UniProtKB/Swiss-Prot annotation:
GO terms for cellular component: chloroplast; DNA-directed RNA polymerase complex; mitochondrion. This is DNA-directed RNA polymerase subunit beta''. It is found in: Plastid, Chloroplast. DNA-dependent RNA polymerase catalyzes the transcription of DNA into RNA using the four ribonucleoside triphosphates as substrates. InterPro entries: DNA-dir_RpoC2_beta_pp, RNA_pol_beta''_euk, RNA_pol_Rpb1_3_sf, RNA_pol_Rpb1_4, RNA_pol_Rpb1_5, Rpb1_funnel_sf. In plastids the minimal PEP RNA polymerase catalytic core is composed of four subunits: alpha, beta, beta', and beta''. When a (nuclear-encoded) sigma factor is associated with the core the holoenzyme is formed, which can initiate transcription. It comes from Glycine max (Soybean). The gene is rpoC2. Keywords: Chloroplast, DNA-directed RNA polymerase, Metal-binding, Nucleotidyltransferase, Plastid, Transcription, Transferase, Zinc.
Amino acid sequence: MAERANLVFHNKVIGGTAIKRLISRLIDHFGMAYTSHILDQVKTLGFRQATDTSISLGIDDLLTIPSKGWLVQDAEQQSLILEQHHHYGNVHAVEKLRQSIEIWYATSEYFRQEMNPNFRMTDPFNPVHIMSFSGARGNASQVHQLVGMRGLMSDPQGQMIDLPIQSNLREGLSLTEYIISCYGARKGVVDTAVRTSDAGYLTRRLVEVVQHIVVRRTDCGTIQGISVNTQNGMMPERIWIQTLIGRVLADDIYRGSRCIAVRNQDIGIGLINRFKTLQTQPISIRTPFTCRNTSWICRLCYGQSPTHGHLVELGEAVGIIAGQSIGEPGTQLTLRTFHTGGVFTGGTAEQVRAPYNGKIQFNEDLVHPTRTRHGHPAFLCYIDLYVTIESGDIIHNVTIPPKSFLLVQNNQYVKSEQVIAEIRAGTYTFNLKEKVRKHVYSDLEGEMHWSTDVYHASEFRYSNVHILPKTSHLWILSGKSYRSGSVSFSIRKDQDQMNIHYLSTGERDFCNLLASKKKVRHKLFRFNPSDKKERRISDYSIFNQIISIDHCHFTHPTIFHDTTDLLAKRRRNRLIIPFQFQSIQERDKELMLASSISIEIPINGIFRRNSILAYFDDPQYRTQSSGITKYRTIGINSIFKKEDFLIEYQGVKEFKTKYQIKVDQFFFIPEEVHILPESSSIMVRNNSIVEVDTLITLNIRSRVRGLVRLEKKKKKIELKIFSGDIYFPGEMDKISRHSAVLIPPRTVKKNSKEKKMKNWIYVQWITITKKKYFVLVRPVILYEIADRINLVKLFPQDMFQERDNLELKVINYILSGNGKSIRGISDTSIQLVRTCLVLNWDQDKKFSSIENAHASFVEISIKGLVRYFLRIDLVKSHISYIRKRNNPPGSRFILDNESDRTTINPFFSIDSREKIQQSLSKNHGTIRMLLNRNEKCRSLIILSSSNCFQIRSFNHGKYYNGIKEGINQIQRDAMIPIKNSLGPLGIAPQVAHFDFYRLITHNQISIIKNGQLDKLKETFQVFQYYFLDENERIYKPDLCSNIILNPFYLNWHFLHHNYCEKTFTIMSLGQFICENVCIVQTKNAPHLKSGQILTVQMDSVGIRSANPYLATPGATVHGHYGEILSEGDILVTFIYEKSRSGDITQGLPKVEQVLEVRSIDSISMNLEKRVDTWNGRITKILGIPWGFLIGAELTIAQSRISLVNKIQKVYRSQGVHIHNRHIEIIVRQITSKVLVSEDGMSNVFLPGELIGLLRAERAGRSLEEAICYRVLLLGITKTSLNTQSFISEASFQETARVLSKAALRGRIDWLKGLKENVVLGGMIPVGTGFKRIMNRSKQRQYNKMTSETKKKNLFEGEMRDILFHHREFFFFVSKNLCDTSQQSSI
């Protein structure tokens, strides 16, 4: 009883660590047997108390935190604001991701902190609270998921899923939350994150590497060791104790002259306490790294056994234990993810808050403006920054540490608890960094644009990857893309309007004809005065066609249909061509049909002398078949042959000119041509004669009778059929020199009979072989060309009454060269002759210096009559677009909402407010032509009403740009000139530099009609538009200017000089505007959507919808400027650093990377400078001769320690403690191989051979020569395949290869390891079988050699002192290197 009264009673909570210490002390004092009896009593006591308490767990015991509702709501509100800023283009994707992580992580951590106080207040005896917070079962993370919120989850790659699980397991998960939560769960829907199989395979590889490591000696005799500094705050105490306990000292420990511990003494708790209290010198310990043999290990280098607490016994299989100790926790931790479910773990930066209200002041010279990782503006301070907060008479000083962000401005008033600074988290928490790629995908379909200030140049010439040099916006302009393999949109111009249902509804025949390169078929309809529509599909013979898509001038003409008459009126220095719409009955029969007249205007709108203004393809010069064109001057020759066959003919001689203009007639020799693939089956032979409708291939039949000629060209076969008759002449010499000649209609004498030839023929000599030849007589078509086409046929006679400097000339020319073959495409007709309208002007004194004529378009609508004019001036016009303000009700030109309207005139404009509203709200969009690198594939993009929107709120008060309205209440035309060409809105605008302005005046305009009716005077108001030139300057005209129009006589007068220039802050065409930007200085200012400005009018702005994406420097942009992207395509890729996740499912791959020696982190940019600095300091301190040798030795040791620390960090983050000696055994094996160099030990080892490090050193000592080798880091897999036992290698991987190579080399396996003995069924050399196999004589011989080595290696002892007694210098150098590298990177 007296003894029990002296016992001390501790009324405290005992945790797992305290129980471990108690058990360790019990074993030390009482031994194993008595300790196990004590622990059995503790276990019985615990079970009895749990039974008496009767703890049970029900679903009602899971109590949710009451404040969860408003906390989640607040986090959602913050996320919504963040999403809006991202939508506006203020923050980019990575900043949004980081801030979203911190918002939800902070919310989740608040729940975790509130759990324990909530249980204590509401239900202190709650079973969940008792079991989890006492440590009996469960932990805070698991309870947090039960009653708090699951929070953010990780995917299998360790990336955070940007959708937090707001529910907990008590409330239940939705389907989406359940699937997301299963990413990290065991046996879930998505089980890819579970690394159980990987952990098992890792264990197998580790055991393969170290299965032969057995404790076979007591002491290896090494004098080396690893130095461990005393406890000085740099290393946590717990890790320092774990590093030392169970080790053996490599050297005596002194304090002054007093010896505290001796060499080969094992370190226990008592000795560690003495080291802590006495603060001795650095402690040198023996580790597996210092053992002198790699095939086994001694007791002193291994240390104490972790199970018994004393030195390890001989025959202990420490290699197997080491492999299992590292691999098995990975499996167990992977299984443990069933409870936590792969919850994302991260950290937030520390914040500094203001203590009270006041004005903040700091030195602005010590900070630099920057951007936080959340996208907020801030100041970065590089040194300690002293901040003062003044509040009345109180001055509070705050010191901001370096590399922190200051979130307020100087002299700003701050409120209490307001965040004023953000301190970057400590290096120990965030030192595990990894580079992550974040892809941003396009949210809509459209074309890509960069900001104007972005320099974009790809790294490679044809690469579509661009690196951004600075922060800028990427824009995706909305629009839908239509692509076709060979479509040439010849009648579509950039900015033209068309029906958006055109390509998707019943107009497939048009696209198919274009795709097959057949003749273009236009659907036409005209309007009669009675406003009745007529539709018809015109004949092939009326329309222009596509001859070759390689000639841009002929494939992109503006085509006017047969609803237009081409009329012209010439005046002084001006040519005005009106396009007047008339009915068929009123059409002048003498005028040539203008449907095939194509106006051809340069892109810049400038004509030079002798430029082609228009061209006309006469239908009579068209043919449907392929053939050869011939045109020559005519001469007469005669050749007499034998009596039986006489041919008299009129021969011709070739007249070689590039452009044959003055040809009266030319000849066309037809032939049938087929281009067939090389693999096609041809059913006719070469030089054979076929009849009409003969089967040539499986699906092609001949159309004519004639001779077949086959020719192979570039993996294709060209098949020609020459129509005509065949003659076999008697003598070859008389006719061969006259082959390929044309014969006119003549009388032929044959056998005393005369036969008259009605048509021209073409004689062609065909030679099959030297003895086989014949003459082919082919039919010829003769075309006569008129001398000149009278301009009166093209234009009315009254147009040429006045003389002018401007002239129009009509010139004919043949499209193909002389003797050139013309090939038709399928059923497409071929144009042989083209008539051109050439523009020229007299070179008199006044206009001798004028070389250019400027073209412009004019449109006038008067009471429903719309007239279009192409105007050509020698002096550039300032006004070229005139419209009538309003139209009578009911008058209309073309119904725009007709779905069958497929081709819209490029000059067409909409005439009323109703029509533009229909076009914007229903079916109409705008074409934008796109140029692709692949010329064979063209595409167009259609902007529909869903992609364009109109803002009409400029009706009263001030306008944008500060322009005030002079007269209110004026009804304006609502037309948006989408076809406006003021700015480079398209890649290939047809009229890019035309002046395209509205007329500006408030005065009246008089129009005098001098027609068949009586004279009528009418006045109307002109639109209020402002002039905008290409330099984005606004010109406001004189309000007193008048314009008098006489549209019938075209006696126009333009006032060009009465402009008063005034500059405003304007919105230019093509400018990008982000959402929520105010552009109108009014009270009810509209908040625009983001987009690009298409049109600017006095009362409205047309904006094309677009999405902005903010990109930072170094981001990778995928695609070219103007490229069409589909929805979901990768737009940009960010590369940023993030903290590595603490989840073991992501930690195990890192362990595997270290053990397999794969590169993890990128190499530092200034690595060479750091190595040079290191070598310089080592040489300076230790001396020149031995500097690099000692540096190499330290590098090997330091690399081993670094590998151990990296593996330990992963396991310690999960709360798993593995003794360093287990990891050191593994690391020793993967760092113990060297590669023999080319110039070293050539007489012993082969160059490139892998040998052990100690074996190489022994060979060098025995040979007494320099050792040249390179130390390698081999992965555990390669190490397992490079052992001394080929049986062990063959049982691991590549069995056939290993065994065959061993047989060829004659390798001998000494069966020293465990695995090879197990395979062969022998006794394994560990445990009880160890003493029988061990060779005692070998042991005595080795001990003798060890004692001799100790006497001779005095120099090694001195070097050991240099290496390990200067450990503090090594830490000092490392710290300086780290600091210098951080400063250089900053």
